[in-house]
Curated annotation (Swiss-Prot):
[4Fe-4S] cluster 1 binds at C31, C36, C42, S267. Belongs to the radical SAM superfamily. Lipoyl synthase family. It is an enzyme of class 2 (transferase). Its cofactor is [4Fe-4S] cluster. It is found in: Cytoplasm. The gene is lipA. The keyword Transmembrane does not apply. This is Lipoyl synthase. Binds 2 [4Fe-4S] clusters per subunit. One cluster is coordinated with 3 cysteines and an exchangeable S-adenosyl-L-methionine. It comes from the Archaea. GO terms for molecular function: 4 iron, 4 sulfur cluster binding; lipoate synthase activity; metal ion binding. It comes from Saccharolobus solfataricus (strain ATCC 35092 / DSM 1617 / JCM 11322 / P2) (Sulfolobus solfataricus). It catalyses: [[Fe-S] cluster scaffold protein carrying a second [4Fe-4S](2+) cluster] + N(6)-octanoyl-L-lysyl-[protein] + 2 oxidized [2Fe-2S]-[ferredoxin] + 2 S-adenosyl-L-methionine + 4 H(+) = [[Fe-S] cluster scaffold protein] + N(6)-[(R)-dihydrolipoyl]-L-lysyl-[protein] + 4 Fe(3+) + 2 hydrogen sulfide + 2 5'-deoxyadenosine + 2 L-methionine + 2 reduced [2Fe-2S]-[ferredoxin]. Optimum temperature is 60 degrees Celsius.
Length: 285
């Protein structure tokens, strides 16, 4: 019998506190903008993923709910507001992501770096994970973000090679994403694959193998869920048993940490995955 996936929906004091801080600081979160199914769990445990550089994306990937259009100019006060919010939430691990900003010459890399540096300065000892766009393949932009003091660098390949032109914006490419990850050096690397878009089992395994070949050590596998009728239809719903089997295959390939669950998203259980990766790296060193 197929096991069902259940979502715990509740509000506690932590949830309310996080919501109040986010509103007070006028900060966008991917939790809200992308309709993440884990918002109750994550905010309820006092964690959030901050989305910088506005909430309007210059790209139109066909799986994504984030609004596409012409973004507003960058807010120079945003690094300070994010850093203060992190401090008020008393976080020791933070995830920072962004929309694509193809309208900016560096894709927003300098602003990303400014946010990371300010968060680190105001919150000594904090672990910072970033989930970045591809910066149009600009490796100098990637290095600029990493050099700001990033502990985990995440960039999502999103889907298998064959489906990339269908699923992602034309300005994205499978090889470009692999190159971004390949040249992200001296940092723990992470990527995610959405399942249920029409890929085959062999293509999933091939994509996992490609990610390992460019040094990715943390892998997230999740079920694609259609956020509205404007996005692509779900082609297949994977069972918990299939997610477990893929997790085992991933570990056999040498990934240090794998989050393989229907409701997983890149930042889901990010802190747990980070420490698991660190521990596994020590055990194999």
């Amino acid at each position: 019998m197929e096991k069902k996936v259940q979502i715990a929906v509740y509000e506690n004091e932590n949830f309310k506190r996080v919501a109040e801080i986010v509103k007070k600081k006028s900060i966008a979160t991917v939790c809200e903008e992308a309709l993440c199914p884990n918002i109750m769990e994550c905010w309820g445990s006092g964690t959030a993923t901050f989305m910088i550089m506005g909430s309007i994306c210059t790209r139109g990937c066909r799986f994504c709910y984030v609004l596409k259009g012409k973004p507003s100019p960058l807010d120079d006060e945003e690094p300070k507001r994010v850093a203060e919010a992190v401090k008020e939430m008393e976080l020791d691990y933070v995830v920072i992501t962004s929309v694509d900003r193809d309208d900016l010459s560096d894709g927003g890399a300098q602003h990303f770096a400014n946010v990371v540096k300010t968060v680190k300065e105001l919150n000594p000892g904090i672990i910072v994970e970033v989930l970045t766009p591809d910066f149009r393949g600009n490796i100098d932009a990637v290095k600029k973000v990493i050099d700001a003091g990033v502990d985990v660098f995440a960039h999502n390949v999103e889907t298998v090679r064959r489906l990339t032109p269908i699923v992602r914006d034309p300005r994205a490419s499978y090889e470009q994403s692999l190159n971004v990850l390949k040249y992200a050096e001296n940092v723990i690397k992470k990527s995610s694959i959405l399942l249920g878009l029409g890929e085959t089992w062999d293509e999933i395994v091939e994509t996992m193998r490609d990610l390992r070949s460019v040094g990715v050590s943390i892998l997230v596998l999740s079920q694609y869920m259609r956020p509205s009728r404007k996005q692509l239809e779900v082609k297949k719903r994977y069972t918990l048993e299939e997610f477990k089997e893929l997790e085992e295959i991933a570990y056999s390939m040498g990934f240090s940490a794998v989050i393989s669950l229907p409701l997983a998203r890149t930042s889901y259980k990010a802190k747990e995955a980070y420490f698991r990766a660190i521990e596994n790296a020590k055990n194999h060193s």
